[in-house]
């Protein structure tokens, strides 16, 4: 009786991880950056380290094992794996992703916490001069770049003009 219950519990755990939004987001990013390689990588959620984001890079049963406490940590682990195990690079303007059909396995387990609760990115010049001309593909690349570099708080200027407007009204400026 205990064995079937244990098997059922394991099955629900596996199904739960497969449906977890952090895991799904991680695999989606991996497929966008390195199409077809996602099947060689296993993603797993772990608890934060003293309230900080954390990730681990290792291998398990012939697969690359990336662990993180959320989608950003998993994406950071993927980026660090690409850089330091595959000698690959993802940047704003292009990628250097020359690696073999079978991904190399990490030789040792790496565990890092990600510094800072909030990791801010972008500035008003980027938003005003550059991003205004981006299409969805370019935005997706930028969002992936942010996730792979631990960014969890991009500049959001949406609605800022309303704050400025109301502030000026409070200081007796008029619409004229």
State each model region's role.
Residues 4-5, 59-61:
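Short hydrophobic "helix-edge" motifs at membrane interfaces and signal-peptide entry regions
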Residues 20-36:
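Short N-terminal segments immediately surrounding and downstream of signal-peptide cleavage
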Residues 1-21:
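Bacterial Sec-dependent N-terminal signal peptides
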Residues 29, 35, 46-50, 60-176:
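Feature activates predominantly on carbohydrate-active enzymes
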Residues 39-43:
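A short, Trp-centered hydrophobic/proline-enriched beta-strand micro-motif
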Residues 52-56:
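Extreme N-terminal leader/anchor segments
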